[in-house]
């Protein structure tokens, strides 16, 4: 069972992916993790990727697909996997198909932009411990202070509204096109992945319940 989760940053994909991994005993495959592992292990693809990255270039889709093929051939992927942050573009999705890497389920977690901004821009972190709070959903006992040490909380650059809106714009420009691509594939029928869209405004538990119902079919 191979799964792609789609949705904007902050939609809750990471949380749901962890729950899926635990229930179905499948790994979450991140292209970033694969790249780092291949470079660390000095594989042929890893050495190629390292050379490209050191020269300031972008790793090609062809290289990434090669890493994906290597990774899904490993024993822990025998029951399937969840793709994390991949594919991001239609050419990458088409390259997966060309290489015969089938996908069983594509699930979109839909959350409006303004809710994403609210979720992410409200996060505050205690730098020393990594503890994370939220000004609305999980506020500290004293505003702006860590519960345990009383030290100042900070807003990470990634959680600033301007940065979040840039990430959302990038998602809408690139990754959102995959929604139409996979909806079309699902409608075509035979040997195509199923496509489901879930309302990500609901609780983690409600989204999880729907996800499991889809995957248990």
From Swiss-Prot:
NCBIfam families hit by this protein: adk, PRK00279.1-1, PRK00279.1-2, PRK00279.1-3, PRK14527.1
Reactions catalysed? AMP + ATP = 2 ADP
Please give the PROSITE patterns that the UniProt record associates with this protein.
Answer: ADENYLATE_KINASE
Does the record carry Kinase as a key word? yes
Q: What class of enzyme is it?
A: transferase
Q: Which HAMAP family would you find in this protein's record?
A: Adenylate_kinase_Adk (MF_00235)
A Pfam match: ADK_lid
Show the segment(s) annotated as NMP.
30-59
State the organism of origin: Acinetobacter baumannii (strain ATCC 17978 / DSM 105126 / CIP 53.77 / LMG 1025 / NCDC KC755 / 5377)
Subcellular location(s) of the protein:
Cytoplasm
Keywords annotated in UniProt:
ATP-binding, Cytoplasm, Kinase, Nucleotide biosynthesis, Nucleotide-binding, Transferase
Q: What does this protein do?
A: Catalyzes the reversible transfer of the terminal phosphate group between ATP and AMP. Plays an important role in cellular energy homeostasis and in adenine nucleotide metabolism.
The cross-references to SUPFAM superfamilies, in alphabetical order and at most eight, read: P-loop containing nucleoside triphosphate hydrolases
Q: What is its EC number?
A: 2.7.4.3
- Summarize where ATP binds, as residue positions: 10-15, 123, 132-133, 202
Quote the gene name from the UniProt entry: adk
Amino-acid positions noted as binding AMP in the UniProt annotation, renumbered to this chain: 31, 36, 57-59, 85-88, 92, 156, 167
Alphabetical list of InterPro entries matching this protein: Adenyl_kin_sub, Adenylat/UMP-CMP_kin, Adenylat_kinase_CS, Adenylate_kinase_lid-dom, P-loop_NTPase
Q: List GO BP terms, alphabetically.
A: AMP salvage
Assembly and partners?
Monomer.
Predominantly, its location class is cytoplasm
User: Keyword Nucleotide-binding: yes or no?
Assistant: yes
Q: Which family does it belong to?
A: Belongs to the adenylate kinase family.
Task: Show the GO MF annotations.
Answer: adenylate kinase activity; ATP binding
Name of the featured protein: Adenylate kinase
Pathway assignment reads: Purine metabolism; AMP biosynthesis via salvage pathway; AMP from ADP: step 1/1
Region called LID, residue ranges: 122-159
């Amino acid at each position: 069972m191979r799964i792609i989760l789609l949705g904007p940053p902050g939609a809750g994909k990471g949380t749901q992916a962890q729950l899926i991994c635990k229930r179905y005993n499948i790994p979450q495959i991140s292209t970033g993790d694969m790249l780092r592992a291949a470079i660390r292990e000095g594989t042929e693809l890893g050495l190629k990727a390292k050379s490209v990255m050191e020269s300031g270039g972008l790793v090609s889709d062809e290289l990434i697909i090669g890493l994906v093929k290597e990774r899904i051939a490993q024993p822990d992927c025998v029951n399937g996997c969840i793709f994390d942050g991949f594919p991001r573009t239609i050419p990458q999705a088409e390259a997966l198909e060309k290489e015969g890497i089938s996908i069983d389920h594509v699930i979109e977690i839909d959350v409006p932009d303004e809710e994403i901004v609210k979720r992410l821009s409200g996060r505050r972190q205690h730098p020393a411990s990594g503890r994370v709070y939220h000004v609305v959903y999980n506020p500290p006992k004293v505003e702006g202070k860590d519960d345990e040490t009383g030290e100042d909380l900070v807003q990470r650059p990634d959680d600033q509204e301007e940065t979040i809106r840039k990430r959302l714009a990038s998602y809408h420009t690139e990754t959102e096109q995959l929604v139409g691509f996979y909806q079309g594939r699902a409608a075509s029928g035979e040997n195509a992945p199923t496509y489901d869209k879930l309302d990500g405004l609901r609780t983690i538990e409600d989204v999880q319940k729907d996800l499991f119902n889809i995957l248990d079919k």
